[in-house]
């Protein structure tokens, strides 16, 4: 029990350290996100204030008539930025048109008045004027298209970068939430383990008190030693079976995940094989829980052995003097090849011909039954359970 208590304390220490580490990291990430948001808003506000110094049409002051202008708080409301940007874009278009008109006049005068040979233009419909005007418009449109294309490209890059950044930020927050949930589940499991350990300690104390009331000290020592040996055996068996059961569940989960991933590629034959394998693992899990985990030292099965290279399973039935050996015909798609029932009689081991014939006729080359169903049925029938 001291070893179990020490293990629980170690688990509690590790969980506490992990929990503290996640809390510190999560708080640091949230603080960085909040600081980044404040800096972004500050940059937006600073940019608009800088524009306000050069342009009177930008007013970043709070619209509150009850306060003097000097007492108003300077701020920028992000919700109205889109509308304001549209207004500014319209104004910039007007400024652009005005600038282009002036530039057109500049080109016009440059090509007409600066020449040593002035052009004789009768009107705006004059061919030379029309040609020069078209050239100016072409240059204007070319420059405008290039600049607008660059602006749109930069805007798209900014939007994509912002979207990717937001997705990664949300993913980080979700990972911290999932980690917190996993830690809570670990605490629940640890508390459950602690309760089970306490119950086991109480049961052991009750058995100890009962033994101490015995008058025979030799029997007490012998019984204590026997119980201790049984406890060590059960602990090792429980650890081994728990590990094997965990591995089986992992294999089952891997098969399920693999089946989901390859569902689109081969939904016919593959799903049938995966389903059969999952069914086999489920039957193995139930068989293990029924005859080992739930019964513990009271199990009716002894010397359970699996010969993977031979495709063979062998075990004994306690108190019945039976030895059962089951051979498989194919490891990839196992079917029962042969069932051998041996019985210990005196000092000899003989074949139970009647049981052999019965079970072989029933299960040999039968594709509809799994080996674990066969094993469970044989045990139940021989032990009359």
From Swiss-Prot:
Gene Ontology CC entries for this record: kinetochore; Knl1/Spc105 complex; nucleus
Domain of life per record: Eukaryota
Pfam family, one: Kre28
Protein location: Nucleus; Chromosome, Centromere, Kinetochore
Claim: Coiled coil is one of the keywords in the record: yes
GO biological process: homologous chromosome orientation in meiotic metaphase I; regulation of meiosis I spindle assembly checkpoint
Chief place where the protein resides: nucleus
Record's keyword annotation contains Lipid metabolism: no
InterPro entries named among the record's database cross-references: Kre28 (IPR031361)
Coiled-coil blocks: 128-175, 229-258
Annotated keywords: Centromere, Chromosome, Coiled coil, Kinetochore, Nucleus
Quaternary data: Component of the KNL1/SPC105 complex composed of SPC105 and KRE28. Part of the ten-subunit outer kinetochore KMN network that includes the KNL1, MIS12 and NDC80 complexes. Interacts with the MIS12 complex subunits MTW1 (via C-terminus) and NSL1 (via C-terminus). Interacts with the NDC80 complex subunits SPC24 and SPC25. Interacts with CNN1 (via N-terminus).
Family per record: Belongs to the KRE28 family.
Known role: Acts as a component of the outer kinetochore KNL1 complex that facilitates microtubule-kinetochore interactions and the spindle assembly checkpoint. Kinetochores, consisting of a centromere-associated inner segment and a microtubule-contacting outer segment, play a crucial role in chromosome segregation by mediating the physical connection between centromeric DNA and spindle microtubules.
Protein name: Outer kinetochore KNL1 complex subunit KRE28
Species per Swiss-Prot/TrEMBL record: Saccharomyces cerevisiae (strain YJM789) (Baker's yeast)
